[in-house]
């Protein structure tokens, strides 16, 4: 079913935001509904992908990875995905290979200690363009520091008008991370979704 959904996306106009049916079909085809991003968040991510220009970074991987990959397939945008779990990385890589998504750079990046928090170990040979959009779904909240490491480790790669999309901001831990980011850079956050389940974070 994923191949049929990918074919459906390939037939759409590049600047068209995916509709509710597109998102629903993708979620059903993905199947991992207990852990997958919510429909509202997926649609929000899709809208930002088609409206933005430049490189995209995703922290963590899953349904959002396939969504962004489908929307970027006919473009020359760099799309880098960081995944710490080797088993899950290999599983998703097989899916990407099956769908012919060679434009996605899926990186196995184990979590390492940065002093006070853990974050992905970035391969030295990885070349990263100026990042226009970040989809921040990882590392998991059980990781020391959660998703905090994004800003202190990646700030030099983020464009001045970069937008960071963070899921799960109905949880206190994620909101505290956004507050802590102000120590690295002035940021503004807008919570979105029926219960504020995700947020847009931009630089002041």
PLM features: what roles do these ranges have?
Residues 63-74:
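Conserved SAM-binding loop of SAM-dependent methyltransferases across substrates and taxa
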Residues 139-204:
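C-terminal substrate-binding/active-site "lid" region of AdoMet-derived donor-dependent transferases
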Residues 89-90:
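Short alpha-helix immediately C-terminal to the canonical SAM-binding loop
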Residues 77-83:
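Conserved SAM-binding motif I beta-strand of class I
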Residues 52-62:
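Conserved class I S-adenosyl-L-methionine
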Residues 114-152, 198:
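A conserved mid-domain beta-alpha-beta active-site/ligand-binding segment of alpha/beta enzyme cores
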Residues 93-129:
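S-adenosyl-L-methionine
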Residues 18-51:
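Class I SAM-dependent methyltransferase Rossmann-like catalytic core
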């Amino acid at each position: 079913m994923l191949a049929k959904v990918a074919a459906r996306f390939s037939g759409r106009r590049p600047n068209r935001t995916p509709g509710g049916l597109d998102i629903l079909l993708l979620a059903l085809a993905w199947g991992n509904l207990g852990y997958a991003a919510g429909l509202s968040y997926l649609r929000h991510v899709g809208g930002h992908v088609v409206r933005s220009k430049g490189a995209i970074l995703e922290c963590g991987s899953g349904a959002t990875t396939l969504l962004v990959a489908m929307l970027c397939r006919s473009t020359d945008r760099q799309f880098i995905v960081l995944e710490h779990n080797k088993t899950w990385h290999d599983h998703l890589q097989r899916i990407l290979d099956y769908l012919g998504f060679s434009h996605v750079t899926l990186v196995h990046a184990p979590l390492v200690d940065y002093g006070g928090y853990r974050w992905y170990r970035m391969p030295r040979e990885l070349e990263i363009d100026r990042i226009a959009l970040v989809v921040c779904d990882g590392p998991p909240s059980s990781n020391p520091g959660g998703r905090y490491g994004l800003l202190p480790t990646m700030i030099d790669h983020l464009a001045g008008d970069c937008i960071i999309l963070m899921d799960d901001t109905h949880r206190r831990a994620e909101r505290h991370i956004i507050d802590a980011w102000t120590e690295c850079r002035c940021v503004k956050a807008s919570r979105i979704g029926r219960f504020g389940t995700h947020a847009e974070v931009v630089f002041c």
